[in-house]
Amino acid sequence: GSGKSTLFKLICGLYQPSEGTVRIFGRAPESIPEEERRKVFGLVEQQFKPVSGNMRDQITLSDPSIFEKDVRRALAETGILPAIEDLPEGLDTPYDPGLLSQGQFQLLSIARATVTNPPLLLLDEITANLDSVTEKQVLDALRAASVKRTVLSISHRLFEAAGGRQVRIGH
């Protein structure tokens, strides 16, 4: 490849550069404490990665410092709040992979990434496995989530549809 995923791993502090430096808001990413990283950047990956617990835990990752109002704001911002409220126990519904469609889980991923209101949003092929109707829903949610944030995206199609400045790396 051309290093797109490596670039994200450098930004997230998972890799250290062999030459030069990486700075996120003036700080080396690897120096940002784990508990603070979600407040600096939100990461949305191609596949939703569930955690044990209920639907609230899927957003908060069991972080007690995240308030209910923040969870609801993130869900409303992405348009997935009505679907969550329709679940038998709402946010308290135990996680099950059959509860939502693949596209709805991508919306949940965006809510997870934005619940702490980070200034940087990293998107890794988030529309790659979606049909065109679901892709439009995800892109609409992304437009809302992108307000007042810097967005870096690895995608073959995303910014063509979403509108935005492009920096191309590789093919």
How should these model regions be labeled?
Residues 2-3:
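Walker A (P-loop) phosphate-binding loop of ABC-type ATPase nucleotide-binding domains
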Residues 12:
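Helix-to-loop junction immediately C-terminal to a conserved catalytic motif
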Residues 20-28, 37:
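Conserved ABC transporter NBD signature motif
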Residues 48-94:
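Conserved "ABC signature" C-loop
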Residues 117:
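Conserved catalytic motifs of ABC-family nucleotide-binding domains
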Residues 121-125:
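Catalytic Walker B motif of ABC-type/P-loop ATPase nucleotide-binding domains
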Residues 141-155, 159-163:
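Conserved catalytic loops of ABC-family nucleotide-binding domains
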